[in-house]
Design a protein with these regions (language model features):
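Bacterial signal peptide processing site
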Residues: 23-26
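Blade-edge beta-strand/turn elements of extracellular beta-propeller
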Residues: 69-72, 141-151, 191-201, 268-280, ...
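Repeat-based blade/solenoid architectures
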Residues: 78-99, 127, 149-161, 200-211, ...
Length: 611
């Protein structure tokens, strides 16, 4: 029987053991934005109402009072429960949990939710758990439409990624799994078809995270899938915390697996170009993936976290290949030069430098990592200086991402926590299996404040947190949270009063670029001095994906506030739009500027948006 070293307790993620981001009537664009409205069609019923010329949100209608997150799971009608299949054998995959993805699958302008589920082990359990798609009813409730949508497929699911890989105007879903991945094509009629075999993306192995991105800027979304370790029931190791009972083992006892890069051929099929692209790495034990443009050259790079192995940063060489540069960039190891148990990750410009920095969830006693992008391809670990290290030191963080919960223009940080060992307290009485999430408020100047205990009681509840994402499910302008728990119920947390500041929500539609506009860079500037930058992105977090629309917090309401938008599309096309009123949902189409716009009702009024 293999015994754990206490040192191992500081590790892994799936591991075991132990301590484990209106136009004014005369809006203009530098790209000679068309003055004609696009024609109506099935995919574009209308181009939207006439542009606003004033801030349509009345001050009297603005919420007031402290911001808080409220658990509305039950009243929203969400009954999803993750099933790990655990029956006492302590198999490694049982520690992983599963992801959650925000998706507007029917293009009604309301974010729906897709939860990934696992399954029972052969010979154990009579039920057949499925992943679940919940349709947004536009009244604060959801309906489970999994079976009618054609998504009731049994698998040991882990993660998900959302993207329109065939550019037909309907977002598709890719699900990673222990026993072969699945690509579900959105048919546009409320149903999905499993096209895995035809597309050639089954990718057998221990797949974890996934991300859609156009690495060669050809207008079609490619797919990167991270892999964990070489594990099977037959090769499962035996470990113990108390020398008597079996515990979950560390990933250090297993060989790694390389991730996979699939190139979109444009005919519904994909080609495995991992080795050709320079991404083959059989030592990797990868969990999280972040889309990042390290050097702002317009070509998408990849950051991949590894569990008990060095993280990887792949710079795009513009010729279909990548160069690994994590060590020279300063993001491979901790400041002390040690490998950490990297899990969920995200990239965002949190301090208005115009450069994306990185946040990473790590194991117990490792704290969150915050790598600041200093420019010139170099990063510095600011976790201690920023104030997030001390509060997160005892947590085992799976999901970690930036989002502006109070819309002040400064991205905050959310972390979903939960240990991997249900018996961890045997060796560390102060460490618990269930842990409360963490919320860090961005104070500006690179500093954060732990406000978990100041935003209501929902975030104080200990859970075995795993996947997490943000979305504005009630269309009131602020960002809500959804998270999964390992072998437990999902949580939907509504942001109450988070929309007291101005905001602008933007959806992108590519024409020369990929349809979702993933990789598009948007800069918002106000007369008051705010200069904000965000990128449309897939993936991030842990096994999960937040909504594709981008939300800019614009700070305190001011009369006659207008903003300017500058967007660089993945194709390289640049557009500028001036005199835009805040508190709107804009749809921007590449080459045409504002396709449609709707005022945001701060009470969550109904408005629809077309893809």
């Amino acid at each position: 029987m293999i015994l754990f070293r206490i040192r191992l307790l500081l590790y892994p993620s799936t591991l075991l053991l132990i301590l484990l981001s209106a136009c004014h009537q005369s809006s203009q664009t530098q790209s000679q934005q068309s003055s004609e409205k696009p024609p109506a069609s099935a995919a574009n019923p209308a181009s939207g109402p006439a542009p606003s010329t004033s801030n349509t949100v009345a001050e009297a209608s603005r919420p007031s009072g402290p911001i808080r997150f409220t658990d509305v799971t039950a009243q929203a009608g969400i009954h999803f429960r993750h099933n790990s299949g655990a029956f006492g054998k302590k198999y490694l995959p049982e520690t992983m949990g599963s992801g959650v993805c925000a998706i507007d699958y029917d293009n009604d302008g309301w974010q729906d939710i897709f939860f990934v589920n696992s399954k029972n082990w052969p010979g154990h359990g009579d039920t057949k758990p499925y992943s679940a798609l919940y349709h947004n009813n536009q009244d604060g409730t959801f309906t489970d439409v999994t079976k009618q949508a054609g998504l009731a497929t049994e698998m040991y699911g882990l993660g998900c990624a959302v993207g329109d890989y065939d550019n037909d105007g309907h977002d598709d879903i890719y699900v990673t799994a222990l026993d072969g991945n699945h690509l579900f094509r959105n048919l546009g009629n409320g149903k999905f078809a499993d096209v895995t075999a035809r597309a050639g993306v089954r990718d057998p192995g221990f797949a974890t995270g996934a991300i859609w991105f156009d690495y060669d800027n050809d207008g079609k979304l490619d797919l990167y899938v991270s892999h964990y370790v070489d594990w099977s029931v037959a090769t499962d190791q035996t470990c113990s915390l108390d020398t008597k009972n079996k515990s979950y083992c560390t990933p250090e006892l297993y060989k790694g697996q390389s991730g996979t890069l699939f190139h979109n051929k444009g005919n519904g099929g994909f080609e495995d170009v991992t080795k050709k692209a320079g991404l083959y790495d059989p030592t990797g034990k990868s969990l999280g993936i972040a889309l990042i443009d390290v050097d702002n050259d317009g070509w998408m790079d990849l950051f991949v976290t590894n569990d008990t192995q060095a993280n990887k940063l792949y710079r795009n060489n513009h010729n279909g290949t990548f160069t690994e540069m994590a060590l020279e960039a300063g993001v491979a190891y901790s400041d002390a030069g040690k490998k950490r148990a990297g899990m969920g990750t995200d990239a965002e410009d949190y301090d208005s430098t115009g450069r994306q920095s990185l946040v990473i969830g790590n194991f117990t006693n490792e704290s969150l990592s915050l790598y600041h992008n200093d420019g010139s391809g170099l990063f510095s670990d600011n976790s201690v200086a920023s104030g997030i290290a001390s509060s997160s030191a005892s947590s085992l963080t799976f999901s970690a991402f930036f989002f502006d919960y109070d819309l002040d223009g400064l991205p905050d940080i959310f972390a979903a926590n939960g240990h991997v060992a249900d018996d961890v307290s045997v060796v560390q009485p102060t460490i618990h299996y269930a842990e409360p999430p963490l919320l860090f408020h961005n104070k500006g100047h690179g500093k954060f404040d732990d406000v978990t205990d100041r935003v209501g009681t929902a975030l104080r509840q200990p859970v075995v947190g795993r996947g997490a994402a943000y979305l504005d499910f009630d269309n009131d302008g602020d960002l809500d949270l959804v998270l999964t728990t390992s072998n437990g119920p999902a949580k939907l947390l509504r942001n109450e009063n988070g929309n007291q500041n101005d905001m602008l929500r933007i959806k992108t539609i590519g024409t020369r670029s990929n349809r979702d506009g993933i990789g598009a860079k948007i800069t918002v500037t106000t007369r008051e001095g705010l200069h904000l930058f965000k990128m449309v992105k897939s993936g991030s977090s842990y096994l999960s994906q937040s909504e594709l629309p981008v939300t800019f917090g614009l700070g305190k309401p001011r009369a006659n506030k207008v903003v300017s938008l500058d967007i660089i599309w993945p194709s390289g096309k640049k557009e500028s739009i001036r005199n835009v009123q805040p508190n709107q949902f804009l749809t921007l189409e590449e080459g045409k500027g504002i396709l449609s716009q709707h005022p945001i009702d701060l009470n969550g009024a109904k408005h629809s948006e077309t893809k």
